[in-house]
Every structure is written in C-alpha cells, then in structure tokens.
C-alpha cells in the first residue's frame, strides 16, 4: 500500500500532499527534497532513506512521489503514478505547476477517489469523469447530481464493465484499428545484426452503440499452429511466414480484455471502452523484417580528409513507401568542409550536431539511394588527441501498411443485440525506434 503521495515542483516545494496512513508524516518530503531533488547526480526512481521508500516519476518540472514504509510492490506503485499522470492530463491538458495550483481542489478530489487508505481503488478516467467533473472553473460535486444519475454512477463504478456506460448511441457505428510498431536495431559495420526487436501497440477508436462484444484475431504463432493441427495440417503455402504466425515474447492487454479466455484458447474477447484506447502492447525479437538496410563505407584519407558513402535500401514492397526518412551520418568534430552529392532528397552538414542530415520525404519500396560525401578536416596541433570514435548512423522513418514483425489482424467480429454491422478500418504503421548502424 501507499502511505503518502506528494506532488512537488523542481525546487522541492510541496504542491499537493495526501497522507493515507499514520506511519508517515509530511516532514518526509523534506528528506526527499534534500536527497533527490537537491542532488545533481542521476538517481534511480526508487530511493530508500532510512526505513522509508520513495518511488517517483518526473513529468516536466513536477515530481510525483509515492511513499511507503511497508514492503510494497514497486511495480504497482509506478503503475498508479503513471495512471495519475494520465488522469490529470485528461482533466487539464498541461501537467505543470500552474495547472496544479489552479486545480488543487480537483486534484485532492481525484486522489481521494483513486486511493483509499493507500490501496488503489479506481484509476478509470471514464468512471472518474462521471462524478468528478470540472465546468467553468468550478468543481461539480456529487451533492449537485440527481439521485438517478448517482445510481447509474454507482452501478457503473461497481459493475463488471466500469469503463463503458450501457446507454451509448451512434448513428454511424465505426471501429478503427491502428497497429503501430517501433523497430529497434543495432547493426555492425560488417552487416551483422547485433540487436533487433519490435515493440508494437494496437490502438482502437471505438464508436459503437450499446454494449458490443468484440472478438479480435491476430496471427499469433500459438493460434496458427493450433488451427493447423485442427485442420489436419492443411494450410496455404503462400506467405509462409505470415501463415505460420509470429512469435510474441511479451504481451499486455487493456483491462477490458478477458484474460481467462485468452489463457484458455488465445482468443482476445472484450467489451471495448468508448472512444480511443490501447487494446494491447506486444514485443517480439524473432524473424524481424527490417524496413531499411544501411550500407556505410568510410575511408580516412590521411589526417585531414575523409570519404564517405552511405547506401540506404528499402526492403518492403514497391507498392509501399517510407515517409519522412531521415538519415543522420556522424562526422568528426574537427570537420571544416563537407561536399555532398545525393541521388534523392536533400542533405546538409549540420556543424552543431557534428553530422550530415539526409532527408528523403518519400522513399519508394524496393529502391536504394546513395549519399557520397568528401569531408575535409582541420589539422589538429594536439598529437595526443583521441581518434574519431565513429558513432553509429541512425535513422528515422515511417512506413504505412507495413509491419516489421509480420503482425496482422486476421479478423474483428462485433456482436451486439441490436444486430448492426459496423464499419471497420485497419491501418498499419512502422516507425523507427533506436535504429542504428555502426560504421
């Protein structure tokens, strides 16, 4: 359990304090200010001062600190702290000192509803907004609500689906799915993959009437292998990688997903919240299809000259394209002049970044472009100066309708008692995480 919560500014001043248990006094905030905020060293997010544990996150100039003297689950505390950030931002867009001071009554109301005696009770923004609302700068409390509305709030807050009200109606029932993946890569100068993984998330925008039951199907390897054995091993041989499914290492679901159903038959079934939400997160490290391959060639011609050739090749279909592609090619700190020739896009030497920035607005699939540069270096008088460390080339990009992991939505079924047929849209997007190639 959490004994106390503090919201502090960058100077260590306490903006909000809520003591949930009597084993903590407000004075412990001063110890945190001296040991963490007052220190110039980089600190871990968990700090033990005496017998008191401080777990904190920093958002802008605001520290959100959970305090406990018990053997508390640190992951639970950090989950609550991050949920607090999301809740505060849903009420006032910017989480800064002025917003907290101007809405301190609202913040205390939220803290009292979210935690009870230090135990998390309600972290659902949708439920909290039913009875803690802010209109025209004044907080509307429960005593101003009608009795029937209070009853509905109670039923929803304590029911099986607190994230969704039953009386939602839309003239046009729509469902949007966005599969967004971030590719992380570290490749050696010889072209060997040293580290590669994909972090993905499935975002949904739900505009459905009533209480729809949704069933989501993905090409998980466990599901695909099970279906193959059920069908006697008969499966289409075309697109073998996609047919065999992908191996998901880690997966996390929204609270609306029935985990028991997923554990038993790997079915993702749920009653979705209204509006936008994150259905699931996943991570995979096997059989990653890299969207771009970088082939760097760097020759040091003596102490004052350097020749550089960087070829970037797209590994996806010619029907697709990469958008806003940016290649950052590092140069030595003593660079004087850069002569650059590119086959596509625009490139410029940026002395403040010690790098050549190559931008290609639209990069077609199954294509390669090359940048060539002659770099003249200033002669160094200091003979003891260290040699150029050759930092890695990094990339930024976005590729639509492509997934590096091979993840795909197989089906999405919606069942509701009014028997409507919703309009469904699916979009895929792959972007660069930490995408680097050593030279």
From Swiss-Prot:
Domain MHD: start-end pairs: 172-438
Record's function text: Component of the adaptor complexes which link clathrin to receptors in coated vesicles. Clathrin-associated protein complexes are believed to interact with the cytoplasmic tails of membrane proteins, leading to their selection and concentration. AP50 is a subunit of the plasma membrane adaptor.
Subunit structure as annotated in this protein's UniProt entry: Adaptor protein complex 2 (AP-2) is a heterotetramer composed of two large adaptins (alpha-type and beta-type subunits), a medium adaptin (mu-type subunit AP50) and a small adaptin (sigma-type subunit AP17).
Cross-referenced CDD domains: AP-2_Mu2_Cterm (cd09251), AP2_Mu_N (cd14836)
Family: Belongs to the adaptor complexes medium subunit family.
Localization (cell): Cell membrane; Membrane, Coated pit
PANTHER family on file: AP COMPLEX SUBUNIT MU
UniProt keyword list: Cell membrane, Coated pit, Endocytosis, Membrane, Phosphoprotein, Protein transport, Transport
GO biological process: one example: intracellular protein transport
Principal localisation: membrane
Native source organism of the sequence: Dictyostelium discoideum (Social amoeba)
GO molecular function, one term: clathrin adaptor activity
Membrane topology type: Peripheral membrane protein
GO cellular component, one term: clathrin coat of coated pit
Name of the molecule in the record: AP-2 complex subunit mu
PROSITE patterns per UniProt: CLAT_ADAPTOR_M_1 (PS00990), CLAT_ADAPTOR_M_2 (PS00991), MHD (PS51072)
Classification via Gene3D superfamilies: 3.30.450.60, Mu homology domain, subdomain B
PTM comment text: Phosphorylated.
Annotated InterPro entries: Adaptor_comp_med_subunit (IPR050431), AP2_Mu_C_sf (IPR036168), AP2_Mu_N (IPR043532), AP_mu_sigma_su (IPR022775), Clathrin_mu (IPR001392), Clathrin_mu_CS (IPR018240), Longin-like_dom_sf (IPR011012), MHD (IPR028565)
Lineage: superkingdom: Eukaryota
One matching Pfam family: Adap_comp_sub
């Amino acid at each position: 359990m959490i004994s106390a919560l503090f919201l502090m500014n960058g100077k260590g001043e306490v903006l909000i304090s809520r003591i949930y248990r009597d084993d903590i006094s407000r004075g412990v905030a001063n110890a945190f200010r001296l040991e963490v905020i007052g220190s110039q060293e980089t600190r871990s997010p968990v700090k033990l001062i005496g017998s008191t544990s401080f777990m904190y996150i920093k958002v802008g100039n605001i520290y959100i600190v959970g305090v406990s003297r018990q053997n508390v689950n640190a992951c639970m505390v950090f989950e609550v702290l991050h949920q607090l950030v999301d809740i505060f931002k849903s009420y006032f867009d910017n989480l800064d000192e002025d917003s907290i001071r101007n809405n301190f009554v609202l913040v205390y109301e939220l803290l009292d509803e979210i935690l009870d005696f230090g135990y998390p009770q309600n972290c659902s923004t949708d439920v909290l907004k039913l009875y803690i609302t802010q209109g025209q700068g004044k907080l509307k409390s429960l005593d101003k609500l009608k009795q029937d509305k209070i009853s509905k709030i109670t039923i929803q807050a304590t029911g099986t689906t607190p994230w969704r009200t039953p009386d939602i109606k839309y003239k046009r029932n729509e469902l949007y799915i966005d599969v967004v993946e971030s590719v992380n890569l570290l490749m050696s100068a010889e072209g060997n993959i040293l580290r590669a993984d994909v972090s993905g998330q499935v975002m949904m925008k739900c505009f459905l009437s009533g209480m729809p039951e949704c069933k989501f199907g993905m090409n998980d390897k466990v599901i695909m292998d099970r279906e193959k054995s059920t069908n006697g091993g008969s499966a289409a041989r075309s697109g073998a990688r996609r047919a065999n499914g992908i191996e998901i290492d880690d997966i996390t679901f929204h609270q609306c997903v029935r985990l028991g159903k997923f554990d038993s038959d790997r079915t993702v079934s749920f009653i979705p919240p209204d509006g936008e939400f994150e259905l699931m997160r996943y991570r995979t490290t096997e059989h990653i299809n890299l969207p771009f391959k970088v082939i760097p060639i760097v020759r040091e011609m003596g102490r004052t000259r350097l020749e550089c050739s960087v070829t970037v090749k797209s590994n996806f279909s010619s029907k697709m394209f990469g958008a806003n592609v940016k290649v950052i090619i590092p140069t030595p700190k003593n660079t004087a002049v850069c002569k650059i020739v590119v086959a596509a896009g625009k490139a410029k030497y940026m002395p403040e970044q010690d790098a050549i920035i190559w931008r290609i607005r639209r990069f077609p699939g199954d294509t390669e472009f090359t940048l060539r540069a002659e770099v003249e270096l200033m002669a160094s008088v200091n003979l003891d100066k260290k040699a150029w460390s050759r930092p890695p080339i990094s990339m930024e990009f976005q590729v639509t309708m492509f997934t590096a992991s091979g993840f795909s939505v197989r089906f999405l079924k919606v069942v509701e008692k009014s028997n409507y047929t919703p309009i469904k849209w699916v979009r895929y997007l792959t972007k660069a995480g930490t995408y680097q190639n050593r030279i």
